Swiss-Prot record:
Reactions mediated catalytically: L-glutamyl-tRNA(Gln) + L-glutamine + ATP + H2O = L-glutaminyl-tRNA(Gln) + L-glutamate + ADP + phosphate + H(+)
Protein name: Glutamyl-tRNA(Gln) amidotransferase subunit A
MF GO annotations: ATP binding; glutaminyl-tRNA synthase (glutamine-hydrolyzing) activity
InterPro entries documented for this protein: Amidase (IPR000120), Amidase_CS (IPR020556), Amidase_dom (IPR023631), AS_sf (IPR036928), GatA (IPR004412)
Superkingdom, taxonomy of origin: Bacteria
A Pfam family annotated for this UniProt entry: Amidase
Organism ancestry: Bacteria, Bacillati, Cyanobacteriota, Cyanophyceae, Oscillatoriophycideae
Annotated function: Allows the formation of correctly charged Gln-tRNA(Gln) through the transamidation of misacylated Glu-tRNA(Gln) in organisms which lack glutaminyl-tRNA synthetase. The reaction takes place in the presence of glutamine and ATP through an activated gamma-phospho-Glu-tRNA(Gln).
Species, as recorded: Crocosphaera subtropica (strain ATCC 51142 / BH68) (Cyanothece sp. (strain ATCC 51142))
GO cellular component, one term: glutamyl-tRNA(Gln) amidotransferase complex
Biological-process GO terms, alphabetical: translation
Length: 482
């Protein structure tokens, strides 16, 4: 799949039309998605209509933006007017939003072509996309394995060249972990940089929308298009959005990179450890100074997250009552209707997290669990603050393993939760984090390197990622998917 800039050049030079590019993406989806199952719905008519409008502009010699005519996948937890948004849940099987999310509106305004809504773990709760109420997405590198989650559909779609770029959301690693497992670039921006208006809420203090791409430059272009202040989102940061492509430089001279010591211990696959360490050594050859950094409370991120996120989910998911939207089960009383609808509509993992959250917020347990978890969250942020006094960017493995077999962890929730061990602390601290491909294991499965920046320092992440990418060939590898 060609890059955004190359496609843009072809459109401007009238070498190809937007309709041709879109048709090619739709044909690719048609050819491989029965195996990969990235998309919950393909919006072919909508896509071709958008592409025609872009071609009309070009025919009139009107200027078009970089994203005009570019095929993009949207995770199905972002509201799209008149197009079903299910959040991967049976409870929203028939929900057609009456309004547009801010990010999809920005992409519409830019002329981007949405080719479909991608699969996800139900309500974005999961690390394998096996919790979807509709289908299980496969990893394009090995169809018997998972793509990661919860944005597995978007990651797999980009890896399988079904679209050029895609949007996902990241609450505890849901962009970076699938990016790592699928061998693509995935970025979780600083909390508040991208509007959450129209994103179906899971854990409001952690959720953040971000890009998936085949290369760093495309991720920078897409972030630039969706970032920015939005008065409709009270957590949105009012800050100017730079042109992120200005940070794409081939050298790392003058940058100090910190390796988080605590991430190289127990539970890390030896092949992942070796591959990530080789990538870190490579950063030295690009001019970076590399030092070790200790974040002693990093390991408490996982237990703190599994109190905070379910607590917020318990509150957010209370709105699915079968009265206003979604499915409705017949019952004699209102309470029975709520109970029956939720029993049928919610999957097991969602029920599990609602129950955990309701418990940790209940009288007598609030101080012992929820309040304590919030204090731990502050301590983790302090560890990061101390680290960034010495270094520009922190690095560690994105995921402790490469892609695991479908069904391997479904009966053991704890081992599934451990998939996000190194990504969760970044969400708790509200920092930007990025996963870039840095090699393969013995089964030809991708390994990801995680880069972590200080608040609003996405530019430094792009600089490190781009310099690494341009001096290696991992991003050019494609899955053996016919």
């Amino acid at each position: 799949m060609t890059s955004i800039r190359e496609l843009h050049q072809q459109l401007v030079n009238k070498e190809r039309s937007a309709v041709e590019i879109t048709t090619e993406a739709l044909e690719r989806i048609n050819a491989v998605d029965s195996k990969v199952k990235s998309f919950l719905q393909v919006t072919a008519d909508h896509a071709l209509e958008t592409a025609k409008k872009v071609d009309e502009k070009i025919a009139k010699n009107e200027e078009i933006g970089l994203l005009a005519g570019i095929p993009i996948g949207i995770k199905d937890n972002m509201c799209t007017t008149g197009i079903k948004t299910t959040c991967g849940s049976k409870i929203l099987a028939n929900f057609v939003p009456p309004y547009e999310s801010t990010v999809t509106q920005k992409l519409k305004d830019a002329g981007a072509v949405m080719v479909g809504k991608t699969n996800l773990d139900e309500f974005a709760m999961g690390s394998s996309t096996e919790n979807s109420g509709y289908q299980v997405t496969a990893n394009p590198w090995d169809l018997s394995r998972v793509p990661g989650g919860s944005s597995g559909g978007s990651a797999a779609a980009v890896a399988a060249s079904e679209c050029v770029v895609a949007l996902g959301s990241d609450t505890g690693g849901s962009i970076r972990q699938p990016a790592s497992l699928c061998g693509v670039v995935g970025l979780k921006p600083t909390y508040g940089l991208v509007s959450r208006f129209g994103l179906v809420a899971y854990a409001s203090s952690l959720d953040q929308i971000g890009p998936f791409a085949r290369n760093v430059q495309d991720a920078a272009i897409l972030l630039g298009a969706i970032a920015g202040y939005d008065p409709k989102d009270s957590t949105s940061i009012n800050t100017p959005v730079p042109d992120y492509t200005q940070f794409l430089k081939p050298s790392l001279e003058g940058l100090t990179i910190g390796v988080i010591e605590e991430t190289f211990g127990e539970g890390l696959d030896p092949v992942v450890s070796k591959t990530v360490k080789a990538a870190i050594d490579h950063l030295k050859t690009l001019g970076a100074k590399v030092v070790n950094v200790s974040c002693p409370r990093f390991r408490y991120g996982l237990p703190a997250y599994y109190i905070i996120a379910p607590s917020e989910a318990s509150s957010n998911l209370a709105r699915y009552d079968a009265v206003k939207y979604g499915i409705r089960e017949d019952a004699d009383t209102l309470i029975d209707m709520y109970t029956k609808t939720r029993a049928v509509g919610f999957g097991n993992e969602v029920k599990r997290r609602i129950m955990i959250g309701t418990y940790t917020l209940s009288a007598g347990y609030y101080d012992a669990y929820y309040l304590k978890a919030q204090k731990v969250r502050t301590l983790i942020k302090q560890d990061f603050d101390a680290g960034f006094e010495k270094v520009d960017v922190l690095v560690c493995p994105t995921s402790p393993t490469t892609a695991f077999k479908a069904g391997e962890k479904t009966s053991d929730p704890l081992s599934m939760y451990l998939s996000d061990l190194t990504t969760i602390p970044v969400n708790l601290a509200g920092l930007p984090g990025m996963s870039i491909p840095c090699g393969f294991d013995d089964n030809n499965l991708p390994v990801g390197l995680q880069l972590i920046g200080n608040v609003l320092e996405e530019g430094k992440l792009f600089q490190v990622a781009y310099a690494y990418e341009q001096s290696t060939d991992w991003h050019n590898q494609v899955p053996p998917l016919q």
